[in-house]
């Protein structure tokens, strides 16, 4: 107990809770009951992790993804095991993060999503908050991309709730120069990794409509005939011969 109470690392406490919950499930299956020390230690670890949440606002870029994933896990623990954990204390800590304008962007997006999922923010207000945050970050694409990553860890469905969000994301990307775009690309890719194939398809349709292009052209899935392939190969061969003639290659 003293070791758990003295632990000051958020990630370690979240991993401990996960291990204790796994152990509790195994005991329940094997013995039909759970040793009382397990929920006691889990509560101590949860309490310690919740106390640390407001301090996560200064999380570094190197730590933010791991911290946010553990924060998502802690949220899951709080909702799935309400008889064990103080859900209100957790949500209160989340609100403290949102009330601090200097919070880490990814963590802020995640906490905003948690508050929405718990019904503490109406969908219209939630979408307005997202759009406003992204609009204010158009000149800081890295910050916007990090925010999107945190947001989509829990509330990716909001992308389909209000077309303004997709439009602002598009403006953030369009505003970035090539070097900046390559910098934010890993975050943008990661943000969409949790989307289901059907959601990706739906998103593709929305983007195609927004840019007024066909979905096939957008995704690169245009059907090409054998004749067109043969003609392209012929032209490629001619181009290669011309380059040799001109001693360019």
List PLM regions with ranges.
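Extended repeat-based interaction scaffolds and adjacent low-complexity, acidic/S/T/P-biased segments
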Residues: 1-249
């Amino acid at each position: 107990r003293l070791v758990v109470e003295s632990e000051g690392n958020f990630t370690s406490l979240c991993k401990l809770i996960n291990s204790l919950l796994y152990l509790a499930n195994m005991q329940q299956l094997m013995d039909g009951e759970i040793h009382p020390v397990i929920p006691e230690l889990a509560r101590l670890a949860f309490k310690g992790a919740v106390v640390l949440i407001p301090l996560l606002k200064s999380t570094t870029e190197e730590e933010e993804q791991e911290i946010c994933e553990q924060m998502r896990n802690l949220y899951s623990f709080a909702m799935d095991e309400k008889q064990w954990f103080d859900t209100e204390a957790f949500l209160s800590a989340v609100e403290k993060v949102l009330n601090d304008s200097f919070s880490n962007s990814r963590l802020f997006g995640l906490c905003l999503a948690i508050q929405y999922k718990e019904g503490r923010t109406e969908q219209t207000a939630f979408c307005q908050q997202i759009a406003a945050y992204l609009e204010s970050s158009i000149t800081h694409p890295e910050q916007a991309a990090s925010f999107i990553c945190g947001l989509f860890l829990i509330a990716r469905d909001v992308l389909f709730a209000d077309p303004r969000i997709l439009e602002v994301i598009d403006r953030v990307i369009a505003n970035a120069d090539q070097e900046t775009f390559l910098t934010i690309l890993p975050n943008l890719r990661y943000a969409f990794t949790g989307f289901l194939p059907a959601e990706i398809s739906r998103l593709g349709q929305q983007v195609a409509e927004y840019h007024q292009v066909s979905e096939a052209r957008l995704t690169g899935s245009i059907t090409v005939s054998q004749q067109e392939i043969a003609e392209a190969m012929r032209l490629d061969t001619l181009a290669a011969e011309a380059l040799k003639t001109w001693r360019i290659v």
